[in-house]
From Swiss-Prot:
It is found in: Cytoplasm. This is Peptide chain release factor 1. The keyword Cytoplasm applies. Belongs to the prokaryotic/mitochondrial release factor family. The gene is prfA. Keywords: Cytoplasm, Methylation, Protein biosynthesis. It comes from Treponema pallidum (strain Nichols). The keyword Protein biosynthesis applies.
């Protein structure tokens, strides 16, 4: 492992010189690739330096205890050795995980789709709660989000909502949110105080560029219509809503939030590209099928991945068996304590 890390250190030094060269900015694609590689190797080298420092401190402690005659001070050194050994073991595990090259999709922006499932109005209200949870998390990471399509209910919930999140390492962080999210709570409309169980489905798709997904114009049927609001009432007097149908796959995307038909079509195409890519990729990648059977769950959107129990202030992720009694904070976007174990489990499963 050390030999491999030293080779990567040489690559990192060379790459550091390249990213400081102004000529790199002449090619946007080349610049993105170099910066992505530089960011990955910088994280790796930071951990490698931490490992080497801990290893040196451990060696010094072993030498010190051999030369020490004071019994009390020897006990202090032994405790320090135990602490350093644990730190060295942790750093070694991190290095093994980081040595796995990052997924090419890791840095992608995402299209996220949230749909109310079992539970009617309560499921729709929880879909709105999840949307707020993810946008709070995005804001805490200084990511940007944009609503692409939404179907609201009269009570303020969402039958479904589609939105994008863009920023650094978005797909890498949120890819494991796909699946069924179950909620247990007393609905505000429940007079008897009984706890209801509802479900919401979340899908996370990497957002693909035009050049990455080939969608021919003749394969897309475009229909225009008037936008409708909660309950189906018409909210627009012009045909600004757009429905795109991808004829080869049957995928349908509707966008109606903008007053401009052109803007709605552009948003719909962003969603369509990601859905077509996701469908094609899931069909042809056997490797992804293996990944879905790994430690972090199947990735199947019918798989129940998480339960939110409001009376107990508890959230449980069933794939990594993480239970937190701070649901109130989680719903405000404090997701790191759930997301990090999922990412670690995924990477460790392929070591």
């Amino acid at each position: 492992m050390i030999e491999k890390l030293e080779e990567l250190r040489a690559q990192w030094r060379k790459l550091q010189q390249e990213v400081e060269n102004p000529s790199l900015f002449s090619s946007t694609q080349s610049y993105r690739e170099r910066m992505r590689d530089h960011a990955y190797l910088s994280r790796l080298m930071e951990e490698y330096d931490r490992y080497l420092l801990t290893e040196k401190q451990l060696e010094d402690a072993h030498v010190l205890i051999q030369d020490e005659s004071d019994a009390d001070f020897k006990d202090v050194i032994r405790q320090e050795i135990r602490t350093l050994e644990a730190a060295l073991h942790t750093s070694q595990k991190r290095l093994k995980t980081l040595l796995i090259p990052p997924d090419s999709l890791q840095e992608k922006n995402i299209i996220m789709e949230i749909r109310g499932g079992t539970g009617g109005d309560e499921a729709a209200l929880f879909a709105a709660d999840l949307f707020r949870m993810y946008t709070h998390y995005a804001e805490s990471k200084q990511w940007r989000y944009e609503v692409l399509a939404v179907s609201e209910t009269e009570l303020g919930g969402f039958k479904e909502i589609t939105f994008s999140i863009s920023g650094r390492d978005v797909y890498g962080s949120l890819r494991y949110e796909s699946g069924v999210h179950r909620v247990q709570r007393v609905p505000s409309t429940e007079a008897s105080g009984r706890i209801h169980t509802s479900a919401v489905t979340v899908a996370v798709l990497p957002e693909m560029e035009e050049t990455e997904v080939d969608i021919r114009a003749e394969d897309v049927r475009v229909d225009v219509m008037r936008a409708s609001g909660p309950g189906g009432q018409c909210v627009n007097t012009t045909d600004s809503a757009v429905r795109l149908t991808h004829l080869p796959t049957g995928i349908v995307v509707v966008c109606q939030d903008e007053k401009s038909q052109i803007k709605n079509k552009a948003k719909a195409m962003r969603v369509l590209r990601s859905r077509v890519y996701d469908l094609e990729e899931s069909k042809r990648q056997v490797a992804r099928a293996r990944e879905r059977k790994s430690q972090v769950g199947s990735g199947d959107r019918s798989e129940r991945i998480r339960t939110y129990n409001f009376p107990q202030n508890r959230v449980t992720d069933h794939r990594v068996r993480v239970t937190l009694y701070k649901l109130d904070a989680v719903m405000q976007g404090a997701l790191d304590d759930i997301i990090e174990p999922l990412c670690i489990a995924s990477r460790e499963s392929v070591i």
